[in-house]
A protein has these predicted regions:
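Mobile beta-alpha loop/short-helix "lid" or hinge segments that flank ligand
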Residues: 1-12, 64, 96-116
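N-terminal beta1-alpha1-beta2 submodule of the flavodoxin-like/Rossmannoid cofactor-binding fold
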Residues: 1-43, 49-59, 119-147
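Short glycine-rich anion-binding loops that position phosphate/pyrophosphate groups of nucleotides
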Residues: 45-47, 79-80
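A glycine- and small-aliphatic-rich helix-loop capping segment at beta-alpha/alpha-beta transitions
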Residues: 56-64, 91-95
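Short, glycine-/small-residue-rich phosphate/pyrophosphate-handling segment
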Residues: 70-109, 123-124
Length: 147
């Protein structure tokens, strides 16, 4: 498993710069997506939308198809989260990510479900997260054998 923590290092998306001579950070990000068997996105919702750095990163992959047919799970964990979750699901549809219902989880009122160390303390939430991860692994396995 690789955790990508470099969203803030990616330059703002510019379609005029979207060729093979992109910044090293973009090339590396795209390669990590290509090399991954699957992707798990976990994000808050900001102002009823997708955080800008996440949307920017995804925009860099639109014309190069890194997410196309890639098993991609989405967890939105926020105070509400509904609007950002739906917006990101639409973006995943546009980029043709493989995102079935079993790979989607909305965790509203997240602050009531984690402790001071951000460890999940709510048993139902923990169970839902574990089920989503299991479903992602199953989807990857099916994807690998061409089912």
């Amino acid at each position: 498993m690789i955790i990508f923590n470099g969203l803030s290092a990616l330059p703002p998306f510019n379609p005029d710069d979207n060729d093979e001579n992109v910044a090293k950070e973009i090339a590396d990000f795209r390669q990590q997506i290509r090399d991954a068997d699957g992707v798990l996105i976990c994000t808050p919702e900001y102002a009823h939308g997708v955080p800008g750095t996440l949307k920017n990163a995804i925009d860099w992959t639109v014309s190069t198809n890194e997410f196309s047919k890639k098993p991609t799970a989405l967890i939105t964990a926020s105070t509400d989260g509904r609007f950002g979750h739906q917006a990101l699901l639409e973006t995943l549809r546009v980029i043709e990510a493989e995102n079935i219902d079993e790979l989607q989880l909305l965790i509203s009122f997240i602050k009531t479900k984690v402790d001071d160390n951000n460890t999940i303390k709510d048993p139902a939430t923990l169970n839902n997260v574990l089920r989503l991860v299991e479903n992602l692994i199953l989807t990857i396995d099916k994807h690998d054998v061409g089912v």
